[in-house]
A protein has these predicted regions:
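Loop-centered beta-sheet repeat module
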Residues: 154-167
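GST-like domain detector, emphasizing the conserved glutathione-binding G-site
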Residues: 1-136
Length: 167
């Protein structure tokens, strides 16, 4: 199994933690520009972090169904409770974390200069490895792109920033 992702990715971290806990062998590869723009969209229809290529050539994305699939195909202790009530509560917490907590994570990652610098540097070094383009240029491009997507793109403005930080 090859896991394509980014070390800074919220969801890559979730999936890698699961694989390590279950002691499932995998090879991690940074999701470079070619994979991001060409291979992953062709194989999956959209680019998500992480994307997984199985040894038989099939591809998967979206951490929750990937974990469910792996749980069904492997013996051993499960991260998914067998008790229906516990299972429901576990999935509810996971859904909340996946769908709602990543937004504040992105806000704090990209809204403040020191965090933006660090996150932009990590992504520029790992993902956007383009020959001839200095790290500072790649970092700035990523920081601008991510801020537009995950801060202003999520509707954060100067007038509602205080409310966003209070929630």
């Amino acid at each position: 199994m090859i896991v394509y992702g980014a070390k800074i990715s919220y969801f890559t971290g979730k999936f890698e933690s699961y694989l390590r806990w279950r002691e499932i062998d995998f090879e991690y590869r940074p999701l470079d520009i070619r994979m991001y723009r060409q291979v992953i969209p062709r194989e999956l229809g959209a680019t998500q972090f992480p994307s997984v290529e199985l040894s038989d050539g099939r591809w998967m994305s979206d951490t929750t169904p990937m974990i469910e699939w792996l749980e069904q195909s492997r013996p051993g202790p499960s991260v998914i409770p067998s008790d229906p009530v516990q299972r429901y509560l576990s999935l509810l917490v996971e859904d909340y974390a996946d769908e709602w907590l990543w937004r504040p994570a992105m806000y704090y990652r990209w809204s403040f200069a020191p965090d933006r610098f660090l996150a932009g540097s990590r992504l520029a070094e790992e993902i956007v490895r383009v020959r001839g383009i200095p790290l500072a240029v790649r970092r700035r491009w990523i920081a601008t792109r991510q801020t537009k997507l995950f801060v202003s793109g999520d509707g954060v403005t100067d007038s509602n920033r205080t409310h966003v930080e209070g929630t």
